[in-house]
Design a protein with these regions (language model features):
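Short, charged beta-turn/beta-strand-edge "cap" motif at the junction between a beta-strand
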Residues: 104-110
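Bacterial N-terminal signal peptides
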Residues: 12-23
Length: 162
C-alpha cells in the first residue's frame, strides 16, 4: 500500500471515530419547556380591558388584537392565538362563557397556549368544540366544515364530575 493511501485510510478511520463519538454525546434538548395548567375565567380582548381598567388610550387597531383570559382576581393572561384561541375571536358566544382552559405555559413567556376549552355553567361543565352532523367531524373554531364545506354547530359535551 502506498504511503498516501495509508494516510487516507488512517484519516478516514479517524473521521469515522470522531463522528461516532459526537453522535454519542448527549446534545442539548431543543424541545420547548412547558407546564400544563388549568386556568379559569372569561376570554376578553386585552386592549379593551386595559383601556377600561387603567384609562390607557389604546389605539383603535389594537383594541381587539390580543386575546387574554381574565381571572376572577382580574389577572390578565395573554393567549397565544392558534386555532383554539382564534375560536374566541370568531365566535363571540365563547367570550360570554365562564371557561376553564387547560393550557401550556411555556418557560419565559407570560402567554399560554390553549389545549382544551371547558365551559363552566350552572348546569355543569361542558367541553366546547364545533361539530359537523354530515361528516361527524369535530373542529376547534367556527368556520365551514373542512370536509363537506357545510355549516357546523357549537357542541357542548358534558364533562363527568371529578
Amino acid at each position: 500500500m502506498a504511503n498516501a493511501e495509508y494516510r487516507m485510510l488512517i484519516w478516514g478511520k479517524a473521521l469515522l471515530v470522531a463522528l461516532f463519538a459526537a453522535a454519542l454525546v448527549p446534545g442539548e434538548d431543543k424541545s420547548p419547556s412547558f407546564e400544563t395548567q388549568t386556568i379559569r375565567g372569561k376570554v376578553v380582548f386585552l386592549g379593551e380591558v386595559m383601556e377600561q381598567e387603567t384609562g390607557i388610550a389604546v389605539v383603535p387597531e389594537a383594541r381587539d388584537r390580543v386575546l387574554a383570559l381574565q381571572t376572577s382576581r382580574s389577572e390578565l393572561i395573554p393567549l397565544i392565538e392558534d386555532v383554539r384561541a382564534r375560536a374566541f375571536r370568531r365566535d363571540e358566544r365563547l367570550r360570554k362563557m365562564e371557561v376553564e382552559l387547560v393550557v401550556r405555559r411555556y418557560a419565559n413567556s407570560p402567554a399560554v397556549q390553549i389545549i382544551r376549552v371547558i365551559e363552566v355553567a350552572t348546569d355543569g361543565r361542558f367541553e366546547i368544540d364545533y361539530w359537523c352532523d354530515v361528516c361527524s367531524i369535530a373542529m376547534y373554531e367556527l368556520k365551514v366544515c373542512e370536509c363537506c364545506q357545510g355549516d357546523i354547530a357549537l357542541r357542548r359535551t358534558k364533562v363527568p364530575d371529578k
